[in-house]
C-alpha cells in the first residue's frame, strides 16, 4: 500500500486540498467550498493528462461517497430521536462536578447523551467526585434537543454536540439506583482508566500542582482552574494545555527508550507502538490534537516524511474521524501542523526558532480570527518562553512525580506552581488587551489564507509581496470596520442589550444585560459560572471588530447590570458611560465604577446621541412609579425608532400622545402585564423587537393576530438575536 501511495500520480498535498474542499462542500453545504473544489478540478484538467485525472476523480468519488454516507447517518440520527431513557451507562472520564451540578456523557440504547443532574446532598457530590468505575444508572429524566446559537457568531451548542455524536441531552429528575458494570468495550475501559488517574492525582496532590498534572498529562482541567484558564486565554497561551506534538513526542520517545533498554528490537517495537498509541489517546480523552500527532508519528516510522506525512494524516482522519475538521480544535491542530511542516526545514538556531514562531503566528492569524476574533501579540513571546518551561521542565517533572506517586506522593514541588501562577497573574497585569480583528466571513478567510500562501511562495522574490501585504491589510480592515450600519438586539437571557454602529465606526451600546439571580446556597453547592456578558455580548462585539465603545448607556438603574458593565470595561475601551440620576445616587454602584476609573455622567431628557448621520433623543427618563428609566426616539436612516427602556407604554403615550414609530425596541419587563396586541395598538409600529427573559413567558391572547395590525414581531427567545443592517435603508435578519 505504501508503494501505491508513493506512486500516486499527483502531489499528495494537492489531493488533500482537493478532498478538503469536497469535505466542506458536503458537510457544510457551502457554495464557496463547492466553488473551490470545482476550481481545483479545472486546474487539474489543465495540468495533468486524462489518465491521471481519471484516477484522481476515482479517489474523489470514493471519499465523496464516504462523506455522503457519514452525512446521511448524521441526518438520520438527528431526525430519529428516542422518546425516553430508563438506564444510562456513565463514561467516567466525562464526569464534571461544579457545585451542586453534575454533568457527564452516557450511553443508552446505542446512543450517546450529554446528561445533567442536580446533586441533592454533599455526600452524593463526594460519591460522584470519587467515582471511577463504569456504572449503569436507572433513572427518571427528560430528553431535550440541545440549544442552537442564540446570537450571531455565538456558540452553537447543538452543532458542537453533533460533532461529538450527541443529538439529545438528558436532564435527570431522579436516580433510582446505580449498579457497577463491566464491559469489553475498549473506549469505555479507557474512560474508566483515565478517570482513575484523574481521581488519583486529585487525591494525592495539592492544587494548583494537581491541575497542571491532570492538564499536561491527561488533558483534563477542572472547574477550579477557571480563573487561571481565563488568564492563560487572555495572554493567548491556553494552547499550552492542548496536548499535541511535544507531549506525544515526549511520551512516545520515553516508551521506545524503555523497551529498547529491555532489549526489544526496532522491528517489534514498531508494532508495539500501535497499542500504546490507542491507550495513550484514550488516556487523553481522544483529543483531536493527540490523535493527529499520533498518526503523524506512526506514519513517520513507515518512512513518510514532510508533506507526504501530513497529507496521509489528513486522509486517515477523513476516514477514522469524519467530524475532525468540523471542530475548532481539529482545524487549528492541522493548521499548526501544516505550517510547521512547511517551515520546519528552514529552522536553524535561536534566530530560526524566533523566525519560525513569527511565521506560525502570522500564518495561523486568519484562522484564529475566524474562531476567536482576536489575537494577543504577547502570545508570540510568551509561547516561545513558556513552551520551553512546560515541555522541557514541567512535563518531565510531572510525569516522574506521577509515576513515583504510586510508591510515595511527593508534593513538595507545589510551590513551583504557585510561583508560576503568580508570574502569570503579574504578566497579565502588565500585558495589553488582545488586538480585536473581528471574525472574517468565509470569503475573506479564504482570500487571507491564499494571500499568505502566495507571500510564502514569493519569500525569495519579494517584489510582489507589498501588493499582497496591502491586500491582506485591507481584508483585515474591512473585517474590523464593516462598511455598513447596524443595530443589533442581542439575546441576553436576562435583561437586554442593543448595539448600534454606523459606517464611520461610531458605536453606542444600550444596556448590557442583567446578572442572573442566584439563590443563596451552602458552600458545597456554590459553583463556578460565567456571566451572560462573557458568553454572549463580549464575543459578539469582538466578532464585529469592536475594540472601543464610544457611549454606553444604562437605560435604568437596575444594579444587576453593574457586574456585566465591569466585565465589559475589562474587555473594551469605554468612551463614556451615561446613566440615570438615580444610578448616580447609589453609592455602592458608583464606588465600584470609580474604582475602575470609568468616566460616568448623567443623561438627561432632551439629550441627543448622534449616530447614523442622525440622532436618538432622550424623550423620557422617569417611569410612572417614579423610578428612573430612559426612553429614546429618533429617525435612523429611513425609519423611526423608539427604544422604550423600562418605561411603560401607556405612561409614555400620555406624555407623547402623537408619537409614532416604525420600529419599537422593548423589553419583556415593560409589557409583562399586557397582551401583544394591547401593547402594539399604542404605537402601531411596523416592526417590534422584544428582548425576552429566559425564564419568563410573554402573554398573547388566543385568537388575536398581530399581523392584522401590520406589525411584525420579533422575540429574542424565538428568533435569537435580531439585526438591522443597511446603507440607506434597513434590512432585518435573525439568528434563527
Where are these regions (language model features)?
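N-terminal leader/targeting segments
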Residues: 1-77, 292, 445, 733-735
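Conformational gate/switch positions in structured elements
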Residues: 9-11, 245, 286, 330, ...
Amino acid at each position: 500500500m505504501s508503494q501505491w501511495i508513493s506512486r500516486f500520480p499527483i502531489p499528495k498535498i494537492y489531493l488533500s486540498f482537493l478532498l478538503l474542499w469536497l469535505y466542506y462542500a458536503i458537510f457544510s453545504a457551502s457554495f464557496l467550498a463547492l466553488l473551490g473544489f470545482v476550481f481545483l478540478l479545472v486546474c487539474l484538467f489543465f495540468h495533468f493528462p486524462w489518465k491521471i485525472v481519471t484516477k484522481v476523480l476515482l479517489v474523489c468519488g470514493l471519499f465523496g461517497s464516504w462523506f455522503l454516507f457519514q452525512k446521511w447517518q448524521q441526518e438520520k440520527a438527528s431526525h430519529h430521536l428516542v422518546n425516553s431513557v430508563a438506564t444510562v451507562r456513565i463514561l467516567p472520564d466525562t464526569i464534571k462536578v461544579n457545585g451542586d451540578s453534575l454533568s457527564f456523557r452516557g450511553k443508552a440504547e446505542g446512543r450517546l447523551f450529554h446528561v445533567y443532574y442536580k446533586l441533592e446532598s454533599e455526600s452524593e457530590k463526594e460519591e460522584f467526585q470519587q467515582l471511577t468505575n463504569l456504572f449503569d444508572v436507572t433513572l427518571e429524566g427528560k430528553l431535550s434537543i440541545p440549544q442552537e446559537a442564540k446570537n450571531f457568531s455565538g456558540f452553537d451548542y447543538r452543532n458542537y454536540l453533533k460533532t461529538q455524536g450527541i443529538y439529545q441531552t438528558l436532564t435527570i429528575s431522579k436516580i433510582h439506583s446505580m449498579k457497577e458494570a463491566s464491559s469489553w468495550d475498549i473506549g469505555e475501559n479507557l474512560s474508566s482508566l483515565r478517570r482513575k488517574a484523574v481521581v488519583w492525582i486529585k487525591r494525592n496532590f495539592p492544587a494548583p500542582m494537581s491541575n497542571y498534572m491532570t492538564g499536561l498529562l491527561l488533558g483534563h482541567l477542572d472547574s477550579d482552574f477557571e480563573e487561571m484558564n481565563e488568564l492563560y486565554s487572555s495572554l493567548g497561551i491556553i494552547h499550552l494545555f492542548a496536548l499535541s506534538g511535544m507531549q506525544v513526542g515526549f511520551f512516545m520517545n520515553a516508551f521506545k527508550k524503555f523497551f529498547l533498554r529491555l532489549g526489544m528490537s526496532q522491528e517489534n517495537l514498531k508494532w508495539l507502538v500501535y497499542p500504546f498509541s490507542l491507550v495513550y489517546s484514550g488516556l487523553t480523552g481522544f483529543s483531536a490534537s493527540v490523535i493527529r500527532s499520533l498518526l503523524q508519528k506512526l506514519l513517520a516510522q513507515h518512512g513518510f516524511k514532510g508533506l507526504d506525512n501530513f497529507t496521509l494524516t489528513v486522509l486517515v482522519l477523513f476516514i477514522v474521524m469524519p467530524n475532525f475538521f468540523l471542530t475548532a480544535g481539529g482545524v487549528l491542530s492541522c493548521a499548526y501542523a501544516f505550517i510547521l511542516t512547511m517551515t520546519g526545514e528552514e529552522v536553524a538556531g535561536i534566530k530560526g526558532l524566533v523566525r519560525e514562531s513569527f511565521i506560525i503566528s502570522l500564518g495561523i492569524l486568519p484562522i484564529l480570527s475566524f474562531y476567536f476574533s482576536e489575537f494577543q501579540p504577547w502570545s508570540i513571546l510568551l509561547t516561545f518562553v513558556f513552551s520551553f518551561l512546560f515541555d522541557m521542565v514541567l512535563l518531565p517533572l510531572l510525569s516522574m512525580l506521577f509515576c513515583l506517586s504510586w510508591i510515595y506522593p511527593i508534593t513538595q514541588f507545589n510551590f513551583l506552581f504557585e510561583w508560576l501562577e503568580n508570574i502569570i497573574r503579574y504578566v497579565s497585569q502588565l500585558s495589553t488587551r488582545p488586538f480585536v480583528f473581528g471574525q472574517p466571513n468565509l470569503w475573506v478567510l479564504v482570500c487571507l489564507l491564499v494571500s499568505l500562501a502566495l507571500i510564502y511562495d514569493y519569500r525569495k522574490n519579494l517584489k510582489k509581496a507589498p501588493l499582497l501585504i496591502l491586500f491582506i491589510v485591507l481584508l483585515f480592515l474591512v473585517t474590523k470596520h464593516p462598511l455598513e450600519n447596524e443595530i443589533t438586539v442581542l439575546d441576553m437571557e436576562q435583561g437586554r442589550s442593543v448595539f448600534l454602529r454606523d459606517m464611520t465606526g461610531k458605536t453606542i451600546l444600550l444596556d448590557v444585560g442583567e446578572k442572573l439571580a442566584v439563590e443563596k446556597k451552602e458552600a458545597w453547592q456554590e459553583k463556578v459560572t460565567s456571566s451572560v456578558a462573557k458568553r454572549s455580548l463580549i464575543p459578539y462585539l469582538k466578532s464585529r471588530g469592536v475594540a472601543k465603545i464610544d457611549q454606553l448607556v444604562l437605560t435604568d438603574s437596575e444594579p444587576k447590570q453593574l457586574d456585566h458593565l465591569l466585565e465589559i470595561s475589562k474587555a473594551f475601551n469605554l468612551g463614556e458611560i451615561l446613566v440615570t440620576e438615580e444610578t448616580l445616587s447609589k453609592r455602592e454602584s458608583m464606588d465600584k465604577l470609580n474604582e475602575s476609573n470609568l468616566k460616568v455622567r448623567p443623561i438627561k431628557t432632551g439629550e441627543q446621541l448622534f449616530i447614523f448621520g442622525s440622532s436618538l433623543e432622550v424623550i423620557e427618563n422617569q417611569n410612572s412609579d417614579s423610578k428612573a428609566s430612559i426612553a429614546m426616539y429618533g429617525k435612523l436612516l429611513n425609519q423611526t425608532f423608539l427604544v422604550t427602556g423600562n418605561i411603560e407604554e401607556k405612561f409614555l403615550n400620555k406624555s407623547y400622545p402623537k408619537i409614532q414609530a416604525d420600529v419599537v425596541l422593548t423589553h419583556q419587563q415593560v409589557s409583562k402585564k399586557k397582551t401583544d396586541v394591547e401593547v402594539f395598538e399604542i404605537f402601531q409600529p411596523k416592526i417590534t423587537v422584544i428582548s425576552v427573559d429566559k425564564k419568563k413567558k410573554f402573554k398573547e391572547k388566543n385568537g388575536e393576530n398581530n399581523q392584522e395590525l401590520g406589525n411584525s414581531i420579533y422575540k429574542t427567545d424565538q428568533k435569537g438575536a435580531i439585526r438591522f443592517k443597511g446603507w440607506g435603508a434597513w434590512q432585518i435578519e435573525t439568528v434563527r
